[in-house]
């Protein structure tokens, strides 16, 4: 992946410098729109505010990590539903259909390869830009 000079500058600024999640979360209000805060070895760390239901989707080529920073959320799989609370995480295996949702606003971090689209191959109205830095 080729970074433009602005993206490269942002990525370099995050290296060896603390990143404050609370400060980053204060920079946006929209739900289901991941914001990149750092990169490491072609992986991106993304903060997302979620509320309500997302679409069922999968990511054919990569696993996806959900880490709950604040609040709680659930993820529905084909055969079960799991709940994640603040301080918990799960790795969703590549290709596995899942639908995240949260009754109340929940703040999470996603860790996934750069370029991963939030809706996988499903597309739709909730598809967000895949490289939106804050």
Report residues per predicted region:
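Glycine- and acidic-residue-biased ligand/ion/polar-headgroup-sensing regions
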Residues: 52, 61-73, 78-79
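Conserved short histidine dyad/triad with adjacent acidic residue
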Residues: 44-60
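A short, N-terminal "cap"/entry segment at the start of jelly-roll beta-barrel domains
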Residues: 8-46, 123-134
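A cytosolic small-molecule/anion-sensing beta-strand core signal
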Residues: 41, 69-70, 85-86, 104
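Ligand-binding loop in jelly-roll beta-barrel domains
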Residues: 94-123
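Short acidic-glycine-tyrosine-enriched beta hairpin
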Residues: 79-94
